[in-house]
């Protein structure tokens, strides 16, 4: 038996042991050391759902001023980026603040694909401003930057790495109260309006990492489908690929009751807890919407129905993955975007090389799901069927190949670049890509099967070409 196969067998046996019956009759079978957790288990026994309040409706952004007035806000920071600052989403939000007599200051220096430096600049602005509420109008980069600014302005004596996820940071629980934050998403991808996650490039190590805590999730998400009409086609596509992979990955994460360690205190239960019955519902519903509406949303900028559904799908998938988590597509995407050389994506008005997040995630998806289908193959076939595959005669052992082929066709139909080679990578870059994936354990450990460095290298190599 190959070493990798032996490792997976051993892994499965450990999971079966950890998931042993805990009823009074059988709980003595696997005795646990006292004090490990309230249940005495080494794997978790509970999950919880934490999500922002969300409000959906065409033109709902006009209510943001009333919301802040109801909160008693007197000094608001409105964060956005320079591309959006003169466009309707920001103008509508500012008009609402003015109409309701809310004093505000605009910060428009958000960086698309933020870095620790751009986070620190926004944090310094927030600390000096002493704001009592925040509004983030933009995509995931803006919402994540605003979350970080709110957190560190509320905890001014903390070191930046205190709240950054391990192993780069200390991953400390957030114990300070934060100010209200209203998120107004203008792209349909990250679902950041629903999650307690803020992602950035850590420049010193050239890796992406995040701050993950329920405490930083927005107080309210205003999901206004009118904002989707300004998005260029490739922005719609790449944002949609993020929704696609949020749904696929969260549905196939390690189940919550197999995740270890079991927390000794609920405050240390991670935001990403593994698949569970509630997150599963949101993931599958989001996937059905992507299958039905993403191509329409990309191909017709005036298709408000399709773009509205994708805006909701982003939030639905956010509710799912924001609690279940994601795994290899996202873990491997961070070095893909972080180590970018010269590639600049179409329809993105930026002054630096950029592999958009959704594109960096989806390029590895066929290889990843071929690999993960060794666990939960039924779920992989179910997802393939939702995306249009005829699975009536498919063999269960071919689940990964069926899903991979279905994804390739889906991506080809949407003119996705032909693999990592098309965005500037070669086999010579694989060691660096693997090295950049290793710190992403907050997500890679949620993959349904373990992966070695050799496995990761093989996945990157298989992703060099898609078609």
Swiss-Prot record:
Name the reaction it catalyses: (S)-3-hydroxybutanoate + 2-oxoglutarate = (R)-2-hydroxyglutarate + acetoacetate; 4-hydroxybutanoate + 2-oxoglutarate = (R)-2-hydroxyglutarate + succinate semialdehyde
Is Glycosyltransferase tagged as a keyword? Answer: no
Q: What EC number(s) has UniProt assigned to this enzyme? A: 1.1.99.24
Matching entries from Gene3D superfamilies are given as: 3.40.50.1970, Dehydroquinate synthase-like - alpha domain
Which of the residues bear the PTM N6-acetyllysine? 445
* One matching Pfam family: Fe-ADH
**What GO cellular component term, any one, is given?**
mitochondrial matrix
Q: How does activity depend on pH?
A: Optimum pH is 7.5.
A GO term, aspect molecular function? metal ion binding
Highest taxon of the lineage: Eukaryota
Tissue localization of expression is: Only expressed in adult liver.
According to its UniProt record, where is this protein located? Answer: Mitochondrion
Gene Ontology terms describing biological process: 2-oxoglutarate metabolic process; glutamate catabolic process via 2-hydroxyglutarate; lipid metabolic process
Enzyme category, top tier: oxidoreductase
List of residues that carry Phosphoserine: 452
Its keywords, alphabetically, are: Acetylation, Lipid metabolism, Mitochondrion, Oxidoreductase, Phosphoprotein, Transit peptide
Q: Where are the bilayer-spanning segments? A: none
Instruction: Give the family per the record.
Output: Belongs to the iron-containing alcohol dehydrogenase family. Hydroxyacid-oxoacid transhydrogenase subfamily.
The UniProt function text for this chain reads:
Catalyzes the cofactor-independent reversible oxidation of gamma-hydroxybutyrate (GHB) to succinic semialdehyde (SSA) coupled to reduction of 2-ketoglutarate (2-KG) to D-2-hydroxyglutarate (D-2-HG). D,L-3-hydroxyisobutyrate and L-3-hydroxybutyrate (L-3-OHB) are also substrates for HOT with 10-fold lower activities.
Q: What is this protein called?
A: Hydroxyacid-oxoacid transhydrogenase, mitochondrial
